[in-house]
């Protein structure tokens, strides 16, 4: 499978970033924002070659004059025309391959509407003429990437978080829990609490600046109350950030107040459980005999689990919920930002997986519904 001629393409379409590359590689070749931007103003300069839309990094770099839209919200594709643009950009501009020559592995969030994966299948076969494709569940791929077949995965990206228990390679669908609280909500929350400091961020372009502040400066406190007290008493936790126009902004307790919303969604006005309780609830929905294995193999994946301190805090919170004699291990691989993609790369290059692909022929015979029969 190392030959690029026949290598499968692995495309992990996240709500925030699209990760794409070739099966068998150890990291994605292309990682770019899942954004489509359209000009906010009429072009005035002749011959500038203005386009009617920009995708990914190009949209990001011209964000000042564009309105940015994310076609994937909460892990579900909501704008198919824009999504096609992103796929087109992935194949032709980023990977520079002809999609009709490669099998394509796509990923999706668990508990997604069935119509979503049918439409994905249809577009791959009818628009891009792919010879074969497959749709895999993101969290399952993360577990593969960590070299396990049993464990509970907390996969938290930009648009959706979910906890998926997997036993001997099988996801247990009745115990999957989904939490519509993820990176984008934290970015919005940080925008809101920075406003309290007198910094105003409102446009879609400014939201990207706040996302950068979040990624560079935020962390999870081990003890929130104590950290708040420290922040109030001294300036030791303050950090500064230089905005694109040279202004310098200072942020203090916002650094840990923002990701604290993962553990206390009430900060965002949400009534759901925090991520620690969600993991615990997922484990409790599983058979009593396998819980011990799940507690000992709790795997974090996705960009929103990248905050410093999150693994220790998870350990502390789950220890408080679980029976006292049980061994709890939180696995936070350093490459977890891309572990879904890496798992897809592993899966698509397994010799045993080759009979799992949905071929163009099968699609022509059965239609898009085949995806529910062939892909778990």
UniProtKB/Swiss-Prot annotation:
Residues 1-2 form a propeptide. It catalyses: ATP + H2O = ADP + phosphate + H(+). The keyword tRNA-binding does not apply. It comes from the Eukaryota. This is Actin, clone 205. The modification N-acetylaspartate is found at residue 3. Belongs to the actin family. Actins are highly conserved proteins that are involved in various types of cell motility and are ubiquitously expressed in all eukaryotic cells. Multiple isoforms are involved in various cellular functions such as cytoskeleton structure, cell mobility, chromosome movement and muscle contraction. Pfam families: Actin (PF00022). Its EC number is 3.6.4.-. Its main location: cytoplasm. Disulfide bonds: none annotated. There are at least 4 actin isoforms expressed during artemia development. Keywords: Acetylation, ATP-binding, Cytoplasm, Cytoskeleton, Hydrolase, Nucleotide-binding, Oxidation. The modification Methionine sulfoxide is found at residues 45, 48. It comes from Artemia sp. (Brine shrimp).
